[in-house]
Structure formats: structure tokens, C-alpha cells
Amino acid sequence: MKLKQLSVSPDFKRKLMIATGVGAAVLAITAVVSPDRAWGNLFVVAYYLITLGLGGALFIALTTVCGAGWSTAFRRVPEAMTGLLPVAGVILLSVLALRLPQYGWHHHGTGDAGTFWFKEFWLQPSFLAARAVGYIVLWIAFARRLVRKSRTQDQQVDPCPAPSIRTSIVFLFVFAFTISLAGVDWIMALEPMWFSTMWGVYQFSGLIMGTLATIIISCIVLRRLGPLSEVFRDEHLHDLGKLLLGFSCFWMYIWFSQYMLIWYANIPEETSYFIPRTQGAWGPVLIGNIVLNWVIPFFVLLPRPCKRNE
């Protein structure tokens, strides 16, 4: 079986350029009307794209370490996803450089943190920026190395050679450590007096769910367009669907564990995160988050035929 190349039609390119222009225009208008919202939205988008790029590298590393040959047919998809890291990384670093004062703690002086002196030290603007650059450079370097080794496997008899396994193992440790710290630095630090020891694994569960969903959608589109029509089977779709179902339940488990422990302890430093998110207009958003990330995936993907039907 040979992989077919995807040819992009001029009409599709034109529509893509129009969509890009509209998005840029909306961003520019929002930046004038409501700068804080525009920069905040751009930051969230950049962070989400970074998690997808990291998820592609994570998928390559995990399948390499586990010797999962079944993913060879669509391995180019997670490889391509790692290409999001440089672009999204530049956007995120730009937002941090230009809009760091958007973080509430930025305006406070030295000593305002009181007993939380370590947070004051950890969130120093220069230290925060240095860590952000370090995370992104490290991720890009590992992602490129993983992709390069993944593509050289096409000419080798052994689908998972030892050098690729070693690189993947090192990346898994680096990934687990850095994604947890990045989640604290970039998202959790928006509310610096709030803390949760489960935030890192909560970020990971969302990352892996988004990655699997992106891989599934991309593979379905590429199978319909031709490049994966001869190699991507219903069995692959079934296996990816099982993974998505499993990690959807894992996400719900982590979400409930975090919420239940904070609700039961009823400590102000912890409840300050959930109280505004369960009241007013944010209440339906919280419910929608659960419905979209667990309720719908659970009941839709539970039957076997649904996992095999694109």
C-alpha cells in the first residue's frame, strides 16, 4: 500500500485565506474595542495550540515506547501536529511580553504576598518569562527529534529502534514535569492566591483528550480526501475511539476529585476558584464543560458501532 499525496485545490486555498483574513480583522477590531479580552483570547488560543502540538509529540513517544505498531498507518498526523509548537509558542511569548500586567499579581510590590513568599519569588516577571522561553525551546527541540527519528523508522526493519525508545522515554519525563509547571505559570497564576495539587494532571487530561480528538478528525478527513484511504481502517478508528472514551472518563475522574476535595474541605484559598464559576452566567459554562468533555463522549462512544462509524 502506498500513501497518496494530498493536493489542495485553489478553491480551498482561497477559502482558507478568506477565513484567515476575517479572523485577523476580528482580532484587530477586538484589540481596539476591548484590548484585555483580545489579548486574553489570543493567549488561550496559543496555549491550546501548544497543547495540541505537545500532544502530537506525546502520542509519538508513547506509541514508540509501547511498541504500538498499529499507529504506523496514521503516524504522519501526530508528526504534523508538532508543527504547531513554533508558531503557537511565538504567539504565546509575544502575549506574555506585551500583556504580562494582565496578571493580577503583576501590580503588587515586594512583600505583598505575605506568607506566600515562594509564590512571590516564583512569579517574578523575569523568572516567569525565562521559564516560558525554556519550556517552549525544550518542547520544540524534543518534538523535532522525535519526528526525525519517527520518519527514519520508515526505512528500518525494527519499527521501534532503541535510540527512538530512549529519546521517547526522556521526553516523557521532561513532558510530565514541564507541562505541569507551565500550566501553573500560565493558567493557574491568573489567580495566584488559589492553589490545587491536582492542576497539573487536570491539564494533562485535557491535553490528551484534545490530541486524540484532533487525530481522529484529521484521519477521517484525510481518509475521505484520499491520502489515508488505503491504510486507515475502521480498526484504527475503533482503537482511537476507545482511547478517547477512556481518557474522557479519566478527565471526569480528575475534575470530580478536584471539585469534591475542595468542596468538602471548604478552605477559602481553594474555594475561591469554583465559587465564581458556579454562579451567574458562568454556571451554565461549567455544566457545559462537563457535558462536552464527558457526558456526550461517554454515551456516544460507548457502543462499539459508534467508535467505528466516522
What do these predicted regions represent?
Residues 1-55, 120:
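N-terminal regions that are enriched for targeting/export leaders
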Residues 7-27, 122-289, 302-306:
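Long, contiguous internal "core" modules enriched in hydrophobic/ aromatic residues
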Residues 28-29, 61, 183, 298:
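Alpha-helical transmembrane segments of multipass membrane proteins
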Residues 30-43, 62-71, 221:
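Membrane-interface helix-loop junction between the first two transmembrane segments
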Residues 46-155, 171:
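Transmembrane-helix bundle segments that line or gate the permeation/cavity pathway
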Residues 54-58, 210, 249, 296:
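Hydrophobic/aromatic residues in alpha-helical transmembrane segments
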Residues 64-70, 300-310:
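Juxtamembrane helix-break-helix junctions at the cytosolic face
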Residues 291-297:
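Core segments of transmembrane alpha-helices
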